[in-house]
């Protein structure tokens, strides 16, 4: 008798994606982050749903409702901190996942890569709007500063900002719409994840060697299900250590002060996972230039497949490109540090140099390294 999972219309789809999926036999732990991201998204939707049951998106009660969740709701504090720190874990996994794609040349699967970039933007937008919801000082001023950047758009800028605000400043209308979008975007992200997987399973996964693995595939279950479960357990362990021992480690103390439009915090900065982009934005003195650099810092990923000059797919056997890749990682860490520093000497100069280096590595050095490595192969 044929197994039901292979004939049932719905089970058949799940079976071909998670059970009988032919998978390269040599994929390393770097390939775990896809499933970890799925776990993070599920966790965020679940904890977010419970928070939404108690949250009120009104400027007068938003801050109090978050306090109420932490003090009065059964296990509300753990749900709130799992949601807040879950976002940090989400972004750690996201950046690892993108980094893996860059290192091993997974961007050659262009449809999967491009859907991934759209997903990245969706999740970044969700996280930004979520940061506004507690209506603390950093929520309010972060929303004001970031939405104000749209005023740099020529001709329609001011109208665009006021349209997004729903008034002449960040106020009740802004908070309500941000809550609505923050609620719906993760579900849109879930749909995009399905499309991401659809395109991935059309071609099959890449692997560390970068060569075709068609001749050596193994079923996803049990080999990679058990590996993914181990990864998920480690993720949950890390998250719970963070939640239980230092839940506010990655947050901003200013967000425990209720939003006050009349008092500007000394240093307005976003959550740590946006600091690298914020540093790039701040490193350009011109407003429009800064906004474009901010967008390009992520959009640059879309042209990476066009800049691939090497005859080899991944960087596993390309030492020059490897050095450049880790230089890029160090540069991004430097930008993250600079984004959290005040705008004064020497941080301004370091930020500008790090921003120039970021674009130069991706646009100039890496393609040149690929050509050099091709020539070395001829010797």
From Swiss-Prot:
Gene3D superfamilies: Cytochrome Bc1 Complex, Chain C. Heme b b566 binds at residues 97, 196. Its cofactor is heme b. Binds 2 heme b groups non-covalently. GO terms for molecular function: metal ion binding; ubiquinol-cytochrome-c reductase activity. It is found in: Mitochondrion inner membrane. This is Cytochrome b. It comes from Zalophus californianus. The lineage of its organism: Eukaryota, Metazoa, Chordata, Craniata, Vertebrata.
